[in-house]
Amino acid sequence: MDDQGCPRCKTTKYRNPSLKLMVNVCGHTLCESCVDLLFVRGAGNCPECGTPLRKSNFRVQLFEDPTVDKEVEIRKKVLKIYNKREEDFPSLREYNDFLEEVEEIVFNLTNNVDLENTKKKMEIYQKENKDVIQKNKLKLTREQEELEEALEVERQEHEQRRLFIQKEEELQQALKRKNKQAFLDELESSDLPVALLLAQHKDRSTQLEMQLEKPRSMKPVTFSTGIKMGQQISLAPIQKLEEALYEYQPLQIETCGPQVPEQELLGRLGYLNHVRAASPQDLAGGYTSSLACHRALQDAFSGLFWQPR
């Protein structure tokens, strides 16, 4: 925290935790007091790099590294021009090349690399694709409106559910108070024994609790994320698919070498004569001499017939 501070007045967040740092398009930070002092006329030059700046373009620094704030702002401006989508390209390769070009432009503008040619390239692209840029802007605006409408519907439905739950709770409290008052009235006016009245009141209270605890079905609501909330989950078994039985196909391995004998034939062919016999402890763990010998033969025979082309 003590590393974050205003380069002009040298005030740090360690000394002043409420310090508000501002950043502009050049990526250099200034505290709010220095911004008000240096840009009292609405415009001025950055004390670090001398770039002409407007006071209205200053914004609160969100990231610890001001370069990240600069990159975020540059990316927003670049994407307003380079706003093509995947469906605007005939192939995925061309779309990926377009995305790579966008990243290169953002990198150059963020790190001050070849600024003149990069800005000229953006101007040429903007002129050549003016119609496509405008069409995608309108498309994006429509999608934002649809998203805002979905969020508003979600908010209204959430408010309706909240009011519904609140009314249910108030109704439950009213029924409980009514039941309690009825019990008190019976105690005053009835000639029945208190134990019997108490048992009847307990039974009525239990039935009332069971009625109140019954789950109420709620209408499924589709949120802006596309997830339906409140819907009942079906526990019915999945329908069995009638398919042909799996048929095992032996694995065909091309070793470019002689055929390795089967494991069962290694002892007859003399391959196990000089292989250490497996101990009882080895056998308990699943180890056999023929298994190790078979693996060694596979490694030894592999690639013996290979010839370079």
Curated annotation (Swiss-Prot):
It is found in: Nucleus. The modification N-acetylmethionine is found at M1. The keyword Ubl conjugation does not apply. Gene3D superfamilies: Zinc/RING finger domain, C3HC4 (zinc finger). The modification Phosphoserine is found at S279. InterPro entries: Cdk-activating_kinase_MAT1_cen (IPR015877), MAT1/Tfb3 (IPR004575), UIM_dom (IPR003903), Znf_RING (IPR001841), Znf_RING/FYVE/PHD (IPR013083), Znf_RING_CS (IPR017907). A zinc finger (RING-type) spans 6-50. Associates primarily with CDK7 and cyclin H to form the CAK complex. CAK can further associate with the core-TFIIH to form the TFIIH basal transcription factor. PANTHER family: CDK-ACTIVATING KINASE ASSEMBLY FACTOR MAT1. This is CDK-activating kinase assembly factor MAT1. The lineage of its organism: Eukaryota, Metazoa, Chordata, Craniata, Vertebrata. The gene is Mnat1.
